[in-house]
């Protein structure tokens, strides 16, 4: 965004909101001269100042950068859903948007330019602000290796198509040969300017839960049967691989000890939690402890760059496998029954991804952990043989009570609050199912409505709380402050 366009926008918003220059300067904590300099286009506000401007005018960063400043841009009306293969992606952590996505983008760019001798990559938005913590720069260099690669972090640019935007340049003999503008939009999926991605193709006819449920009732089928009819019987081979990876991740996480990488000094807790059974432990306490241990195991493996499955993202990947494995062991469900539950969960995740977002950089942690909780509640509902109405209520309930949840990872690492949050969401998914057993008939809010609400809420969140590590715990935490 040009400096002068910043000035025009600020002046327009002042007029619309009836805020004087002096009052706005006080709100922002800057001088009137500084504000005037912005308005004239002589200087540009810092990223923190832009975040404060967004808060002052009740705008998201996206709307401030791209919109008129008067109303929210609407998400395009979707047409169907992608394959569930785009929901569950097997890869390495710690972040589907900050490691898996950039890795894919770099791989595509490298294949396009096999004969160059230098790459330059510029990270913008959340990729820049939390890229070091997530290891984005490391994965970029590793993927483009052995070609000489420099990575730059641009913290100021805001006129971006997505908060996770990166730009790549290829050189031969110091001459620019090619460039690419790309976005990592969550769950390991990417968009590239000027390139049609095969994975973006919709294969499901319906894009709302209402329509899917009506179709299932009309044809007397379960959601997983709708998946099988659409994807083909080989989808079970894919889901078998997904489930195997999920279980292996829990097993590895439970058996590994030590300190997680990144400098925050977080110790692994999954194995300790799993072994801490007490002689007077109630069945309910044991259930919570084991489910949490499984969720911690996945979260810790992800934080260490281990092999995980996005569900819907790396940062929220511990919720679904934790609950599925616990109930498989408790009730003896077959692998095929678990796979059917995973198919059901994937449809819920795709509905959120299509009609809202699963990206913490776009809509905060509600988009990641809230979606994971909803997916897990729906999967559990399928395992328990619940009705479509009960499954919908459980999934809706799971998202509703994560609305407004912030994404403010300390040091930009997927550790605090991310790992513990997976465990809490796993327990919440079970609570949502328990409520659905009794209260489904009295519900007033649909799953489609709560997904729409989540998207609007996410766009209203300050950029500080959308995976930029510039607000909340990420801002206030200091390693010298000890817990009493």
Where does each model-flagged region fall?
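DNA major-groove recognition helix of helix-turn-helix/homeodomain DNA-binding modules
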Residues: 48-63
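A short, Lys/Arg-rich alpha-helix, primarily the initiator
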Residues: 1-17
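Accessory "access/gating" subregions that flank catalytic or transport cores
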Residues: 247-364, 472-484
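Functionally critical mobile loop/hinge segments
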Residues: 380-484
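C-terminal regulatory domains involved in ligand/effector binding and gene-expression control
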Residues: 143, 149-281, 289-290
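Short, charged recognition helix plus adjacent turn
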Residues: 55, 65-78
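A structural-propensity feature for long, helix-poor, extended segments
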Residues: 118-154, 343-381, 388-394, 400-432
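Short alpha-helical DNA-recognition segment
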Residues: 18-37
